[in-house]
Design a protein with these regions (language model features):
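Conserved alpha/beta-hydrolase
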Residues: 51-81
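Conserved alpha/beta-hydrolase "acid-adjacent" motif
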Residues: 237-243
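N-terminal cap/lid segment of alpha/beta-hydrolase-fold proteins
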Residues: 1-24, 28
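Short beta-strand/loop motif that positions the catalytic acidic residue
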Residues: 224, 230-232
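Accessory cap/linker subdomain of secreted extracellular hydrolases
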Residues: 141-218
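Alpha/beta-hydrolase active-site loop
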Residues: 56, 87-108
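Catalytic active-site module of serine/aspartate enzymes centered on a nucleophile-bearing elbow/loop
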Residues: 263-267, 271-320
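Short, surface-exposed "cap/lid" segments of acyl-processing enzymes
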Residues: 24-63
Length: 320
């Protein structure tokens, strides 16, 4: 397999990515990353300049390549080598970038079926491409069937239970309710028209948050008639694992859904239910081989049996 540095244009903005090529492809996949300032590999730039190297889309690209599926993954606007401004990019622009990436992939892939594989926020865009009939199938990793506003509330409740005991005590002493504080911040964002705001001292992309809070994926999911794969970790605290079943109830095409054991939102084991507090430690482990095998197996079942034979090797190769 080989990785080629490529660029394509979206609404006049240069988007940089990696095309992973294979011989005799059975399909080709567009990989769409999750929320935050992340690059093509799903590595995130955190406040203060620190980087969280999750490598989720890189691992998927490597597994797919061994299974005979070339892929394109790309940096978000204002991240990695892409142009544009991350802080003023909303969900509509992210969808436009996904569509432009799919057009580039279609021209390069040479007539094979096109797939969209999204993680977290990327599942919304993968689902939209599937609903529009632009792809032959969609894989949704850590996806949701609820509005963004409901997801933010659910996240806050989950994360509050995972705070260290000392932090929970401080919140009680200060008479601070985490859920109420989250709602207050959300109301501030929704009442503003600014692209960028400061919330609790942190710079946030308010434009994206307004888009996300309003967004309801259910009507889009209900229009999908192509095959869909949904995978969420049983310890995910950023989207409800049970939404896998909700996605399955909404889509009209062939559906395969999995809630995988003790995996977190980063597709890695979280046996202690640490949530984001444990992310920096968990990324020392590889992306779950089970998840990679489920993806390549799903591709094989719909678009080519060669992916099954190659997929076992993909798990070991991409999981290192």
């Amino acid at each position: 397999m080989s990785g080629e540095e490529v660029t394509f244009s979206s609404e006049g903005c240069g988007i940089a990515g990696t095309f992973t090529e294979t011989a005799d492809p059975v399909a080709a996949a567009l990989l769409i990353t999750g929320s935050g300032r992340v690059d093509r590999d799903s590595d995130a730039r955190l406040p203060g300049g620190l980087k969280l190297r999750t490598g989720i889309t890189r691992a998927i690209a490597e597994a797919l390549a061994v299974a005979g599926v070339p892929s394109l993954r790309y940096d978000k606007r204002g991240a990695g080598r892409s142009g544009g401004d991350y802080w003023t990019t909303g969900m509509d622009q992210r969808l436009a970038d996904a569509r432009a990436g799919l057009d580039w992939l279609a021209a390069r892939a040479g007539g094979v079926p096109l797939l969209a594989i999204g993680h977290s926020e990327g599942t919304f865009h993968a689902a939209q491409l599937a609903a529009d009939g632009a792809v032959a199938g969609a894989a949704l990793l850590s996806g949701s069937a609820q509005t963004g506003g409901k997801i933010l509330g659910w996240q806050t409740r989950q994360l509050a239970t995972r705070l260290p005991a000392s932090a929970r005590l401080i919140l009680r002493l200060m008479r601070t309710d985490a859920v109420q504080a989250q709602r207050k911040n959300q109301d501030r964002i929704m009442a503003s028209s600014a692209d960028v705001m400061r919330i609790q001292g942190q710079r946030v992309n308010a434009r994206w948050f307004r888009d996300f809070i309003r967004y309801d994926p259910a009507p889009v999911l209900a229009r999908i008639t192509v095959p869909v794969l949904a995978i969420t970790g049983g310890q995910d605290v950023q989207v409800p694992p049970q939404d896998v079943d909700a996605i399955g109830a909404l889509v009209k095409g062939p559906f395969e859904g999995h809630i995988v054991g003790d995996l977190s939102h980063l597709m890695r084991p979280d046996p202690d239910s640490a949530g984001p507090r444990g992310y920096r430690r968990s990324v020392r482990q590889p992306v779950s081989p089970e998840v990679l095998a489920l993806i390549t197996g799903w591709v094989a079942s719909h678009w080519g049996h060669r992916a099954t034979a190659r997929g076992a090797g993909a798990v070991d190769e991409a999981g290192r």
